[in-house]
């Protein structure tokens, strides 16, 4: 059997098997799916009835809400604008049972308020918002309601009604955890598909799942071997689309989309940035999409969450680890002794060294980086989430997608490759309307990034230390589309690994 090559984020791409090597069930599913695919199908008209209470609000109140939350809605069609759902009481009254888990939240987030009416109305939507803005429920609630409206909650074969694609297994698991809570109340089954584990259990779960949350590589593999048919998908979501393109999944995504029905599919894309590559992808498969932007121009320079207090300390390289210990000692005492702190390193070896250092200083610490297997990563994340570890040392593999509640402080021991990655790192704190705090240890070795960092600080109205200004304010653009933020996470001092395939 061929050795497997692990793609970033743990999404494995095994060598394709011949039809004779596949189990008989996969072939049976494929044959049945083809028969169903050829059945006539039509897209039911989506119905969205605006709440009377929402209709009673004045246009001035609506405009003030949009301005307060920096919400911009761009719609090239001639459809009348839909008012944002500003309160949970404004949600459609039908199937109100699915709203029960919302009782733990006070009000919708801006991205939820703006996208819900559009998605309930059946429109294709592009949502552009910072991480931690509530995007999962923004696309998740309309997904569940769409399945309920169709009356086809139960699935007897591997033909899901909705597919949600995410860049990493961790993010896929987080989406699954949230949607399962809402789906359980109305008997809608959700399953999570990702690489690095055996496929047999996933094939079994696919038989009854109405919603499939998946990483692109594993979903494509299961589609190609006949284990799942996407011909009845009514609702397709690409979450963190920019991240998936950075990781090289564009062809997998396009192949998956081509397997879903164009005329009957509602398509949703969420992204933190809006580069040309993401625009081109959206233009290739979305129909008259409405674009909802939260915050400033997403194609402009990256902007940090203004609720995060950013502190930059210019230090000598040899001082960083001692300073880290001081910062943690100060932040992990008194009433804050149990506060969660996320510590970012650039290299895997650096992360291992820092984790050992902090453990030797009696901090409750866990680590997550590319060298850990799936079980070890989940164990570390669970320890951090439950509080048995209050400090998590991570490389950029954890910089996007991880939704860890109540991270009080982010510390950058080493500045990342780009300022975009800096913004994503510190975005782990200050989520869901909370305030956050980020401290960055900046050295002369990072001076090429000083100008871009200064721009981020100024845009968020943060203090810029004189020591940082001395490095200069020139911004040097740096593209790394092929490798994203991860190529420095590889030890380049080693020779390349030779991959050998068995006969």
Curated annotation (Swiss-Prot):
Annotated coiled-coil segments of the chain: none
Catalysed reactions, as listed in the record: ATP + H2O = ADP + phosphate + H(+)
Subcellular location, record wording: Nucleus, Nucleolus
Biased composition (Basic and acidic residues): 1-13
EC number: 3.6.4.13
Residues annotated as binding ATP: 129-136
UniProt keyword annotation of rRNA processing present: yes
Gene Ontology MF terms in the entry: ATP binding; ATP hydrolysis activity; mRNA binding; RNA helicase activity
Sequence ranges assigned to domain Helicase ATP-binding in this UniProt record: 116-292
Domain of life: Eukaryota
Function as written in the Swiss-Prot or TrEMBL entry: ATP-dependent RNA helicase required for 60S ribosomal subunit synthesis. Involved in efficient pre-rRNA processing, predominantly at site A3, which is necessary for the normal formation of 25S and 5.8S rRNAs.
Domain notes: The Q motif is unique to and characteristic of the DEAD box family of RNA helicases and controls ATP binding and hydrolysis.
Protein name, UniProt field: ATP-dependent RNA helicase dbp3
Organism (species): Aspergillus fumigatus (strain ATCC MYA-4609 / CBS 101355 / FGSC A1100 / Af293) (Neosartorya fumigata)
